[in-house]
Amino acid sequence: DSGRAEDLQREVHWMTEASLATGRPVTFGLAQSRRHPTAYVSMLDQISESAKRGARIFAQSTTRGIGVLFGFANRTPFDRASSWRALRNLSLKEKVAKLRDSEYCARMVREAKDNPPPIDFSQIFVLPKGDVRYDLGIEDSLQTHADRLGVSPGEAFIHLALENEGETLFNYPFLNPQFDAVQHMLDHPQVVIGLGDSGAHCGQIMDSSLPTYFLKYWVKERQHFALEQAIYMLTSEPAQLFDMHDRGVLREGAYADLNVIDYDNLRLPPPTFVHDFPAGSGRYIQRSSGYDYTLVNGQVFMQGLDHTGAIAGRVLRSA
C-alpha cells in the first residue's frame, strides 16, 4: 500500500544520507514477508539507486526461510490449550506416553479444535528425516497432511509426531518463505549473507546452519553459485562490509579460520533439541557432517564434530 511504500522510502533516504555524509557503509536486515511479499523488491531497487549516488548501503538476508520450529521436543502451535501446555515440563518419552493414551489424546484433539492458534496450517511444513529440506511446498504442509488423513490439524500434528517417536519437527518460515525471493536477494550486488538467529530464540529458531545450507543447496544441489563465489560470499564479502581487512582472506598475517570440507559428503540433518544449558534448559542444535577440520589461528580447533581443546581465538576490535 502507499503508506508502506512511503515508510520504505523514508528508511532508505536516511540511510543514504547517513552513508553519503560519513562515507561509511550502512547495513540493515531485509527479508520477504508474507504480508508484503513484494516490498523487498522495492527496497532492492531503492538501494540500487542509492549506490549509483555513491552511498554504501547493503542489506543482509538469509540463504533460506527464517522459521519457527515446532515439535513436542519443545513448543507446539497448540500450547495455548491446557492439555497441550501441561506436557511442557515432561520428558519427550513421557510426552509420547501421553500421546499414546487415547483418552488424553482425544482431549488434546478436542482442545486444539476449540482453541485454534492464529496461524495458517498450510504454511507449517513437516521437516523430513535424513538430509533436511527447507524448499517444501503445499504438499508437505500440516494442512495437506490433515486433509489426507481426514483429521484436524491438531490430530495430524500428533499423528506425524508419533511416526517418529515424538521427534518430528515442523517448520514455519514466517520470513523469506519463497525461495525465488531468496534467490533474487542473494543475486543482488547490494545484499550480503547474514541475519541468522541461533541465540536469542534458541528454543524456537535454528539458523546456525545457514552457511552449510548455502553450500549444500545453492551450490552443490542447485549449482546456482560456483563454489569459489560461494566461499567469497560467506567469508570475504561480509568481512569487507565491516572493514575487517584481516579477516575472510587467506593472506599472511590475516586471522583466517579455515574449514577443511569433504564437499562430496557434506550433509545436514534436521535440528534436534538438547538440554545442555544451566538448570537443564534446552535449545535447538543442528549438526552437519563433512567438515573434517576447523583451524583457528593455525591450530586445529575442531576435528569432525569434536572440539580438540584448543582455544586459539582472539577478541576482535575495530581498527
Task: Please provide the spans of the model-predicted regions.
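C-terminal helical cap
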Residues: 132, 140-148, 153-183, 214-265
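Short loop/turn motifs at secondary-structure junctions and domain boundaries
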Residues: 135-136, 239, 283-286
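Polyanionic/metal-chelating signatures
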Residues: 6, 11-198, 207
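Short beta-alpha connecting loops at secondary-structure transitions
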Residues: 29-35, 200, 220, 273-283
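Generic beta-strand/beta-sheet core signal
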Residues: 1-3, 29-31, 59-64, 194-196, ...
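Long, structured ligand/cofactor-binding scaffold of large enzymes
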Residues: 199, 203-219
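C-terminal cap of metal-dependent C-N hydrolases
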Residues: 184-191, 196, 208-210, 260-306, ...
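Active-site lining segments that contact anionic ligands and/or coordinate catalytic metals
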Residues: 23-25, 54-58, 121, 188-191, ...
